[in-house]
Amino acid sequence: MSETTTVPPIETVSEPNPFIVFATVATIISAFIGYYFLQQSKKHTPVLKPDEFQKFPLIEKIRVSHNSAIYRFGLPKSTDRLGLPIGQHISIGATIDGKEVVRSYTPISTDDQLGHFDLLIKTYENGNISRHVAGKNVGEHIEIRGPKGFFTYTPNMVKSFGMIAGGTGIAPMYQIITAILKNPEDKTKIHLVYANVTESDILLKEELDNFAARHPDRLKIHYVLNEAPANWQGSVGFVTPEIIDTHLPKASNDTNLLLCGPPPMVSAMKKAAVELGFQKAKPVSKLGDQVFVF
């Protein structure tokens, strides 16, 4: 009798489905990316609280004129951001002579600045908060809450901005200008008329002129002085309808006019704007108004 040989079964190994492998890898990568950006967003935590004053330390004071300075305040962590939309402002509060005093200021820094924020403040003889801040030494704190305001800038929201600023009224304009010019996808044109008493009163002039030199097709600046030196290239006196008509864009549906400065100046500019075809400014400006007063 012959012997029969049993052949053991051969195990077959199936090839992995490439589509399943790809889907698995893609899922893992997507999960990792999502986790990464979640952690990054947590790192850059906005710290402002609209209904609660918080203390922030003064970390640097940069003198920019005889009565104005940039005050840099630290955030809790170097990866924190203030949490202030472009065009809005904060409130500084203090107890002065037994009374609670609150004033609004717009930082000149933008919200992508991490670890600190900058305020440009002019010290007035009768300005309670401005003197309060000016009297602070590095390491001392001020109390701030926010954000506040009805204007929030988004890229390309209009074709062009006409801006009229007086003195420290340059602060919200500077913040908006910075946000526009640092974004290569933002095609907004900016025309700024900036008024001051003397040439030494022009705040952030070097920074503004550098912006204009680097972006001549996007930013135009015209300076106006009450007291001008010899060979002054700008206008002399007050901002007039003629100056506005010459140096700012014409009224149109895709042009907004932004105003910020001393109350008498702003009042005169609102009247001039109407003469030039802009809509009458409302008592309280809101986003979407053709003429917005900060």
Curated annotation (Swiss-Prot):
InterPro entries: CBR-like, Cbr1-like_FAD-bd_dom, FAD-bd_FR_type, Flavoprot_Pyr_Nucl_cyt_Rdtase, FNR_nucleotide-bd, OxRdtase_FAD/NAD-bd, Riboflavin_synthase-like_b-brl. Keywords: FAD, Flavoprotein, Membrane, Mitochondrion, Mitochondrion outer membrane, NAD, Oxidoreductase, Transferase, Transmembrane, Transmembrane helix. Pfam families: FAD_binding_6 (PF00970), NAD_binding_1 (PF00175). One of its GO terms (biological process) is protein histidyl modification to diphthamide. It is a single-pass membrane protein. Residues 51-154 form the FAD-binding FR-type domain. It is found in: Mitochondrion outer membrane. This is NADH-cytochrome b5 reductase 1. It comes from Candida albicans (strain SC5314 / ATCC MYA-2876).
